[in-house]
């Protein structure tokens, strides 16, 4: 379960940011992740809870927001958001090409917002 290491890294980032602003109590961390980031949201939420229990961050919430996938067609270059389960092999809405697309976004993972006091 790599979500545990992801949660550890996210908490390291949060701890560093809180130190910069001289606040200690974490209330909420909002994380954005791409649909291709290979994250299981429930597993990340569980890992966050496990890692914060018994720490200064106990009781803090994690909010996960999924970013859509954006592709550039390998045939005509049009940018689009694919639909369905086979995201990378979705046909281009302009020319119908199904392969050779370039991923423009959807693999990202970052802390978008931190609430603390």
Curated annotation (Swiss-Prot):
<dbReference type="Pfam" id="PF01155">
    <property type="entry name" value="HypA"/>
</dbReference>
<keyword id="KW-0479">Metal-binding</keyword>
<keyword id="KW-0862">Zinc</keyword>
<keyword id="KW-0533">Nickel</keyword>
<dbReference type="InterPro" id="IPR020538">
    <property type="entry name" value="Hydgase_Ni_incorp_HypA/HybF_CS"/>
</dbReference>
<dbReference type="GO" id="GO:0008270">
    <property type="term" value="F:zinc ion binding"/>
</dbReference>
<dbReference type="GO" id="GO:0051604">
    <property type="term" value="P:protein maturation"/>
</dbReference>
<feature type="binding site">
    <location>
        <position position="2"/>
    </location>
    <ligand>
        <name>Ni(2+)</name>
    </ligand>
</feature>
<protein>
    <recommendedName>
        <fullName>Hydrogenase maturation factor HypA 1</fullName>
    </recommendedName>
</protein>
<dbReference type="GO" id="GO:0016151">
    <property type="term" value="F:nickel cation binding"/>
</dbReference>
<dbReference type="InterPro" id="IPR000688">
    <property type="entry name" value="HypA/HybF"/>
</dbReference>
<feature type="binding site">
    <location>
        <position position="76"/>
    </location>
    <ligand>
        <name>Zn(2+)</name>
    </ligand>
</feature>
<feature type="binding site">
    <location>
        <position position="73"/>
    </location>
    <ligand>
        <name>Zn(2+)</name>
    </ligand>
</feature>
<feature type="binding site">
    <location>
        <position position="92"/>
    </location>
    <ligand>
        <name>Zn(2+)</name>
    </ligand>
</feature>
<comment type="similarity">
    <text>Belongs to the HypA/HybF family.</text>
</comment>
<feature type="binding site">
    <location>
        <position position="95"/>
    </location>
    <ligand>
        <name>Zn(2+)</name>
    </ligand>
</feature>
<dbReference type="GO" id="GO:0036211">
    <property type="term" value="P:protein modification process"/>
</dbReference>
<comment type="function">
    <text>Involved in the maturation of [NiFe] hydrogenases. Required for nickel insertion into the metal center of the hydrogenase.</text>
</comment>
